[in-house]
Amino acid sequence: MPGTKAAHGRVGRPPATSRTQILTAARRLIDQSGWEKLTIRRLAAEIGVAPTTLYHHVRDKEDLLFLLIHEYADRIPHPDLPAEPRDRIVVCALAIHDSLAAWPWAAEVLTTDGFIARLSDSALKLVEAILAAAVEHGCTPEQAVHVFRSLWYYSVGEILVRAHSPGRRPDDEPPARTTPFLDGLDASELPHLAALGDRWVSLSRLDTYPQGLCAFVDGLLAQTPPTTAPGVDG
């Protein structure tokens, strides 16, 4: 019968691959093996398409990672911002930290100074809020950038140390190899460390980021006295 042969063959184009499908599969591979092992070829195999198909949607692996970060940033609810500039900086920095702590691989991708230029408008809103609050406090625009960069280094450093340290989460058991962490120290040379001993391990597992952040913000802003409203003596 005419058409019988065609009925058993491949008819038409294969189903289109959507960006959502690509990003979902990429997140799955990152969860399984880490972002370092994600490749365009592995992603194509996961979806069941040729690698060339993916290049219609992304330029390269770096572009793919930033698309994932943009999508994630778009889904993060922004906090209500306090009126006081100092408190606003703290709230914004906490929001940035907490969102990246839930996705620590993204913090690792963003550990280059040029990352700001690659972020979406949604991701930049908290950065803008920190700069605006610093300027409102009395910083110059240049000082405001230094405030943000200092807080960024502190936040990302804390996230990556915890992400790469087994047993750092409160619900984890500390690794056996850290049990004798400070045993055998010479108390005459290192009296404070020797006195702490294994308590260092439990102390280092405490979440002190919020307290450290507040102290850091206060120290940074102390270098620039707050502006005084016009007509107010002092």
Could you tell me what each predicted segment is?
Residues 21, 25, 29-63, 67:
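Helix-turn-helix
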Residues 179-195:
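Short glycine/proline-rich, acidic loop/turn segments that cap or connect secondary-structure elements
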Residues 201-202, 206-230:
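C-terminal all-alpha effector/ligand-binding and dimerization domain
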Residues 1-17, 192-199, 228-234:
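N-terminal intrinsically disordered/low-complexity leader segments
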Residues 70-75:
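Short, basic, alpha-helical segments at the C-terminal edge of helix-turn-helix-like DNA-binding modules
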Residues 77-125, 141, 148:
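Hydrophobic alpha-helical connector segments
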Residues 126-148, 154, 158-177, 201, ...:
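Hydrophobic alpha-helical bundle segments that form small-molecule/ligand-binding pockets
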